[in-house]
């Protein structure tokens, strides 16, 4: 067992035994899944999605969350080979001078001109349990997605 795994297990044991709450900041989504009950996904300093862990990992709503989850390695090589990875194009915008409206719009494969680059979306329920909120005008409708699904124009646009 690695040192990282031992520390994570200790944190979980302490949380269970003493009723602790953690704010756990990480980029490793497998670690986040192991340690967290609820997950917030941030992009350029703003929360773009917040949900209970299982809901977020099985039905993400924000395209950035979907792209992150598509990049998480899976232990089964057969599944890994056949899974579509959503690759975000373009450069990450400057956090000092973020884009107007939706901060993710310059890299978003679901971008709709005249809406995403003009109107900032609210962090509200976008389908699913009321505790699952996302900051997106055109949230993901199903998961897992193929790259083609991700690039498809949102319905009604």
Predicted regions and their residues:
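Charged, flexible cofactor/metal-binding loops and thiol motifs
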Residues: 52-157
């Amino acid at each position: 067992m690695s040192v990282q795994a031992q520390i994570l297990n200790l944190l979980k044991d302490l949380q269970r035994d003493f009723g602790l709450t953690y704010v756990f900041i990480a980029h490793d989504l497998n670690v986040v899944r192991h340690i967290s009950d609820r997950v917030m996904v941030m992009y350029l300093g703003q929360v773009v999605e917040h949900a209970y862990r299982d809901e977020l990992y099985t039905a993400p709503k924000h395209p950035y969350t979907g792209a992150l989850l598509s990049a998480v390695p899976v232990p089964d090589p057969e599944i890994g080979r056949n899974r579509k990875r959503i690759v975000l194009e373009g450069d990450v915008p400057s956090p000092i001078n973020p884009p107007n409206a939706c901060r993710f719009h310059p890299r978003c494969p679901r971008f709709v001109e005249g809406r995403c680059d003009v109107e900032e979306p609210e962090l509200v329920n976008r389908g699913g349990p009321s505790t699952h909120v996302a900051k997106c005008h055109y949230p993901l409708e199903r998961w897992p997605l193929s790259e083609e699904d991700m690039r498809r124009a949102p319905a009604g646009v």
